[in-house]
């Protein structure tokens, strides 16, 4: 071997070792070694140390300041979402539940449903601020709500109407498959009775009602349920339109059974699907009456006196002249009369 060979070999070995060490350092450990399962589980993204976390398959809430798990029942807000912690610390998930007199829905991940959302294939609406169901009672208290720039029609049990016409603030709308409501055109009419009725929509004060009442009875209207005025409103519209002779034979127009007997005796009933502008619609066991506006996609629009939210049974308010809408096969509709 040449006398200079040994030092050269030593230098080459040192360079090779240095390159191998640098490569291993760049990988974070010995060359080719992978992170262990324990190292992966400890990564912050996999195990949050505050807020809504999951422990042994259950969602819980850890206070960001104290780092302690919440055990006391109550609502918490995290990352803009509302959650409900039950006694013991588990977050309510995947069910409808009640806290006090209010009802809520919690998704599978614990988020409280707010605004418009889908639950078991149906659309619902809960208060965007606190998640409470917006329960509105009977059909006379149904109403519209605005959410993210769109109108939705709220029914009982917080359900949102879909694929049907609705009335919001006395105006006709159609709710699509997502519940979004679009205004319907108010169709022109040549019927004189309907023209008169439309001009009365929204009237609700005692002074307004006096005119519908006194023309027939000749005395003042009393502002209670003891004096329902749906029938006198229908009669007033026919009289104002110059069509009262068509219903004069009904006798006491304020008494709905009289109108029904008139239709029975003279064969004036027509099929609901064939209803026309200005026809008379009778509800229940002769309990209420109104004027037909139009039939649309299996529904019937009406204009009624003593209707709307204020006319709910048991109130002491006179109600209002309101535009309403019903399914043609609604069991609450007795029938349609064409005088």
Locate each region found by the language model.
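Extracellular adhesion/carbohydrate-binding repeat motifs centered on closely spaced tryptophans
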Residues: 5-11, 15-189
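Intrinsically disordered, low-complexity
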Residues: 26-45, 167-210, 273, 299, ...
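N-terminal capping segments
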Residues: 185-243
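Substrate-binding/catalytic groove segments of enzymes
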Residues: 204-207, 241-249, 297-301, 309-313
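Short, basic/aromatic beta-hairpin or loop at an interaction surface
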Residues: 241-263, 293-294
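Short alpha-helix capping/helix-loop boundary micro-motifs
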Residues: 263-271
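Aromatic- and glycine-rich peptidoglycan recognition patches
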Residues: 269-270, 285-339
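Structural motif
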Residues: 276-280
């Amino acid at each position: 071997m040449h006398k200079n060979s040994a030092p050269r070999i030593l230098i080459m070995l040192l360079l090779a070792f240095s390159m191998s060490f640098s490569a291993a350092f760049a990988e974070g450990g010995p060359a080719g070694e992978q992170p262990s399962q324990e190292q992966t589980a400890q990564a912050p993204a996999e195990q949050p140390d505050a807020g809504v976390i999951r422990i042994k398959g259950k969602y819980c809430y850890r206070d960001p300041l104290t780092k302690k798990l919440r055990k006391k029942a109550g609502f918490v807000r995290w990352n803009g979402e509302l959650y409900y912690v039950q006694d013991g610390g588990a977050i309510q998930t995947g069910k409808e539940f009640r806290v006090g007199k209010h009802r809520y829905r919690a998704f599978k991940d614990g988020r409280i449903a707010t605004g418009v959302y889908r639950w078991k294939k149906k659309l619902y609406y809960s208060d965007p601020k606190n998640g409470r169901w917006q329960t509105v009672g009977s059909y006379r208290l149904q109403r519209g709500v605005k959410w993210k720039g769109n109108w939705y029609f709220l029914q009982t049990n917080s359900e949102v109407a879909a694929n049907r016409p609705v009335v919001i603030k006395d105006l006709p709308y159609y709710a699509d498959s997502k519940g979004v409501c679009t205004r319907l055109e108010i169709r022109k009419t040549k019927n004189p009775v309907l023209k008169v009725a439309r001009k009365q929509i929204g009237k609700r004060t005692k002074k307004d009602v006096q005119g519908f009442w006194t023309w027939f009875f000749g005395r003042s209207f009393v502002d209670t349920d003891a004096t329902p005025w749906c029938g006198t409103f229908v009669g007033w519209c026919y009289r104002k339109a110059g069509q009262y002779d068509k219903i004069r034979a009904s006798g006491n127009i304020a008494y709905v059974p009289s109108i029904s007997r008139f239709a029975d005796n003279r064969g004036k009933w027509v099929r609901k699907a064939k209803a026309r502008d200005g026809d008379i619609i009778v509800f229940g066991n002769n309990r209420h009456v109104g004027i037909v506006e139009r039939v649309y996609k299996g529904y019937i629009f009406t204009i009624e006196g003593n209707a709307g939210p204020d006319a709910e049974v048991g109130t002491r308010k006179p109600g209002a002249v309101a535009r309403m809408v019903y399914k043609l096969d609604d069991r609450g509709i007795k029938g349609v009369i064409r005088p």
